[in-house]
């Protein structure tokens, strides 16, 4: 079995500074991060890409014209939009809606799991922003769709 290795050279965004450096990836895993000390930096450093950890979006309803409530296509479109903006994982968030819509949202999330790859952000789970909200604190949520957590229809 051969090992896939890749050296990524660029400007590393570190805890305390940005430094020229290299990340070594083997079989899809980062095995080393080596920052240069600044001595002898090459003149083309400004043209090197920034290399930073991916962002995690813990509350998103979609992006790039896609809505996660719009089934598998909305979930996939959102995942592709987010990765293009540095978000590597996310929690799609459903809105307060009729129960069948929330079930469809959960099913779209489940269907999106196999689509994970380098060109899509990974959904880590999902949030239901509603329907279990207090009517006193509903904000912009449609009160028609608010539900009691003890609702037997969810079984």
Predicted segments, located by residue:
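N-terminal metal-binding scaffold of metallo-dependent hydrolase/deaminase domains
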Residues: 1-39
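Divalent metal-coordination and catalytic microenvironments
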Residues: 10, 23, 28, 48, ...
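Divalent metal-dependent hydrolysis catalytic cores, especially in the metallo-beta-lactamase
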Residues: 61, 76-105, 120-135
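Glycine- and other small-residue-rich loops at beta-strand/loop junctions that grip anionic moieties
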Residues: 67, 94, 143-146
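N-terminal hydrophobic targeting/anchoring segments and the immediately downstream early-domain regions
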Residues: 71, 82-85, 108, 112
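Metal-coordinating catalytic core of metallo-dependent amide/deamination hydrolases
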Residues: 107-155
């Amino acid at each position: 079995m051969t090992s896939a290795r890749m050296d990524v050279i660029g400007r590393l965004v570190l805890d305390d500074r940005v430094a020229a450096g290299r990340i070594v990836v083997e079989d899809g895993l980062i095995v080393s991060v080596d920052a240069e000390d600044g001595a002898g930096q090459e003149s083309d450093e400004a043209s090197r890409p920034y290399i930073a950890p991916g962002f995690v979006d813990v509350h998103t309803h979609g992006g790039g014209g896609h809505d996660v409530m719009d089934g598998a296509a909305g979930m996939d479109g959102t995942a592709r939009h987010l990765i293009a903006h540095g978000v590597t994982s996310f929690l799609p968030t459903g809105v307060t809606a009729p129960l069948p819509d929330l079930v469809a949202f959960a099913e779209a999330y489940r269907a999106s799991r196999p689509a994970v790859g380098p060109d899509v952000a990974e959904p880590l789970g999902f949030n239901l922003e509603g329907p279990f909200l207090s009517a006193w604190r509903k904000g912009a949520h449609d009160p028609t769709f608010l539900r009691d957590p003890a609702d037997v229809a969810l079984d």
